[in-house]
Amino acid sequence: MSQGPRTCSLLLVLLLSHGGAYQREPSPRQDLHPLLQKMAEEIIEGSYLNALLDLTLFERSHVWTADLSHRVLAYLNSKNVAFTIPSLQAVMEAHLEQYLYQPQKLLEDLRATDNQQFHTAMKCLLEDKWGHLDLEDVVINLGDIRDEALQSPGVNRSLFLITLERCFQVLNALECVEVLGRVLRGSSGSFLQPDITERLPQDLHEDAFKNLSAVFKDLYDQTSAHTQRALYSWMTGILRTPFNVTDGSVSWVSAEKLWILGRYMVHLSFEEIMNISPIEIGLFISYDNATKQLDMVYDITPELAQAFLERIRCSSFDVRNISTIHRLGLLVCFYDGLELLDATLAQVLLHQMLKCSRLRGFQAGVQKLKANLLDIATENQTLNETLGSLSDAVVGLTSSQLESLSSDAVHSAISTLNQVTGWGRSQIVILSAKYLAQEKVLSFYNVCQMGVLLAGVGTQAFYSMDHKDLWQVLRSPLSQDMSDLSPVQQQGVLGKLMEAEDATSGIAEVPRALFKEVSLYDLWKESRFNATVLKAKELRRSQALFLYEFLGKTTERPEELLSAGQLVKGVPCSHIDAMSDHLFLALFQYFDNNFSLLSPDQVNCLAWKYWEVSRSSMPPFLLATLPSRFLSSIPPSRCVRFLISLGKRRLETLVLDSDKRSVVVRKVQQCLDGVIADEYTVDIVGHLLCHLPASFIERGISPRAWAAALHGLRSCTALSSEQKAAVRVRLLEQWGPPENWTAETTKDLAPFLAFFSGDELHTVATKFPEILQQTASKMVGVLLPKEFLWAVFESVQNSSNESPSFDPTFGCHGVVTPSSDDIFKLAEANACWDPEVLLCMEEDTFIRNVELLGAVKGFSRAQLMALKEKAIQVWDLPSRWKEHHIVSLGRIALALSESELEQLDLSSIDTVASLGQQTEWTPGQAKSILQAFLEDSGYGIQDLKSFHLVGFGPTLCAMDPTEIQLIKTSEFRAVVARIGTLFCSTPVLAGFKKKAEVVFGRPTEWTSSILQELGTIAAGITKAELRMLNKELMTYFQPSAIRCLPGEVFKELSTEQIASLGPQNAASVTHSQRLQLSSAQLQSLQRALDGAKTHSWQTDPLSSSPTWPASTGSPTGEPASQALWLGCTLLLLTAKS
């Protein structure tokens, strides 16, 4: 047994170190301290928690001596209690594990402790001086145990509930508030439900009340709207108590009470705010921490913000004074009375409004306010003169306004421009060009100055940099900005570095953000790698596979490699299989710590190894990756351990095959006995909530558990339509139809609003349009139901002040066209505009919003065509468009015909790369883009650099297979991994595969790292070559390559090869590929999907049943030491600080 359980057992049996035989037997008549005598009686009664708390209390005030153990055992013997160490240990372990997996029992036993014992338990939670137990030669580090305890679901919940129930009767209020704070801060606020205020004390003295209020303020964002309202009511109930005026003439709200309320001040009513006395609001604004508090009222509404501003105006503070403006926090986002402002104050306000992006909603109003302030700030001055003083309002400047700027103005304002967030891609392109207009070559100084504008620098400019300047950038803190560059820009930087004569000597110095772009071929040439250097690098799997093998030849300490950051991605299954039992168990923690980096195949290998080495201590979640029969072998006694372990993981990434995932979920339901009875079970289930079937959600979650379950369901991102319908049914049962909903209800249900019907959403759109629009703004880029989008569209239309157009253009007269406000609020719901309406949009509106419109995923072909026509109306023919026009189009560019694409100026690879971000091009369009670049740039295929190949993106697939062979091998090999991400036609992939043979040799020479590097290029392999591949390499095909293999080629795989695909690649096999397979091949595929062991695919029949070891003192579930440490932890009642 490991040191953990041994230490715990020694503690529990009073540290008898004599193995069960006593050296001497003291007389039970010898004096035994009453506390130890009480402890011994509790051991006899089976009250082990009470006994341990008494022991802890005794140790705090007495020196532990060796004879005390013998005295206690003598006392037990005198009571005819014949314990042996093994039997007592077994009883103790069973009891501890009962706490671990049934934290309700912990709650019950804590309720049964006497006041002195409960006091001890709370002190263990509070005081660092209780950080260890020192009992002769054994020291128990309670601080380390504290960190482990809360890994067990439900522990925090039990501690939270018992603290509310008993603490305020046993300890002083300040100590109890501190305990609550520790427990709540470790719970993500999920314990705070609206009914919690019924259990909170109503008579706290001032300091305790302030401290507890501070805890609730810290957890504000993690609590529901209903809970926020309930906590606000509890706080104000206490704050109002000493205030006896009842006629309403004087407000109960004082400056100090506003400070105590903190973010809860946004729940004050309009009337209460308007009733605050000028003296008190002035005193509040004068507090040094008032600005910090007002900076955090993210959910304040315009109405309440303007009410506060009005009261401040009535105080001694002048809101037109610069020092006052600096104190207003987020209230500046709703500043009114602009007619009295001068340019200086407008500039000050604009600077303060940088923080307005943190507001929850109302951003359209913020943008309008910034635009008005921008007009005032530039009044009687040119834009060139005021550019540096406009803060982030400059992002509201149109492309024509930016183009009108002088280069000198941009240089002068660069310290402001380089920090602004929210720039559009086209704006960055214009400003970068303006800044570099006077520079012949990009220098280190320029790069230092550009900040966020660096992303607008052309790739050719990076490629033309001096080597020394480039290395100076990469060795400076500026290297962190490399991650903000596009792939084509990153490759331009790398391409320049690799051209140097001593390029390979510097590969190890390439910063983290760029290192993952270094080619496998270039890694082969570098011999100076070590594990320390790689700790800070981000690695592709192909890089990790090569580097792990390379470094494995230079060290005999695998822990050095496994601790080297992302190098764990490269551990092959053969290495895991070859580890000795002892080494594997010693190293498993490295794998577990980096679990998110492991592939499903690696996890499957770990599961098999653990099963063979130590199935009794195997983490139960690994069973889900083994063949399904292993799940059926889990007995009821192991169910809770299985659920806890699996619930901490993401099942969708652990088990990729949907059929097998269904098997796992059925086992979960079986373990739950078809019901989630309470919130403790919700804690246990964890992320598995997202996979429970609709019928279970609708009928299997009890009303008591529903609130906690709903909190968990909020994080589910891939619920099926059936699951969504079940959630909707439960919500309607709980809250009734939307007609009955309050604002708090609607806010709390915001993550689920898209589940409701069009009629139900119509009600929400009418009652709470702002909440609906806020919800939609958080779902940008998500494919949403049409009903939801139409509801958002309706809510915006209802609040729009737009009038019918008087545009004489044919078909536009009388049409209500979109405004910038409308477009901003609608986000993805812009897909609801009629094409005719989009075509009638005002020119200025189109110019200001083209990038936002280009990002809408739901536009139809007709809508895109209308927007393209609008672009031609505004910008003239495509042949007149500049780079910033093209990059701003987004998906609108998809409407360009082949001839229109050929008219574009595509001489810059960055322009081509912006078009390449779209993946819906037809082959003809892609060919036009490719040809246009070659013609406009003057390059031939043989002249292309590696960054050109990256910049083409999916349009590279339009290259003729014969043209591919003209690409320089030195440029091709640098970007093989990037090209391997493209989904090209089979002939094109075959062409790239032929080119790859020049670099990597024929397929029979390919290694695991080469196969990973090739990606989809490997799908260009021939039938004969595929048959010749070693089956051990099959797991190293990328899943995308498996999907790209034509069915007639895929069917050439042998049954052994198919069985060796591994779970990840097997899950990537398409339906059309399956149709080509024989029954024997399909059976092999099923084995791979099920996680069968690849090297025993013929000898390990599907029907064989796994066997478990005989029951021991440490049942299967968690590693023995961990389980007992956690058990000890529960008894010691430690909590994370």
From Swiss-Prot:
Q: In which tissues is it expressed?
A: Expressed in the inner ear and vestibule.
Region Disordered: start and end of each range? Answer: 1095-1119
Compartments it resides in = Apical cell membrane; Secreted, Extracellular space, Extracellular matrix
Question: Which residues, per the entry, are lipid-modified as GPI-anchor amidated glycine?
Answer: G1113
Q: Which residues form the propeptide?
A: 1114-1137
Give the similarity note: Belongs to the stereocilin family.
| Protein's gene | Otoa
**Domain of life from the UniProt record:** Eukaryota
Function of the molecule = May act as an adhesion molecule.
Q: Which InterPro entries match?
A: Stereocilin-rel (IPR026664)
Describe its membrane topology. Answer: Lipid-anchor; GPI-anchor
Q: Where is the composition biased (Polar residues)?
A: 1095-1115
Q: Which residues does the record list as glycosylated?
A: N156, N211, N244, N289, N321, N380, N384, N530, N594, N740, N798
Protein name per the record: Otoancorin
Q: Which GO terms describe its cellular component?
A: apical plasma membrane; extracellular region; side of membrane
**May I ask which residue range the UniProt record assigns to the signal sequence?**
1-23
Record GO biological process: cell-matrix adhesion; multicellular organism growth; sensory perception of sound; transmission of nerve impulse
Cysteine pairs forming cystine bridges in this chain are none
Q: Which residues form a coiled coil?
A: none
Q: Name the keywords, alphabetized.
A: Cell membrane, Extracellular matrix, Glycoprotein, GPI-anchor, Hearing, Lipoprotein, Membrane, Secreted, Signal
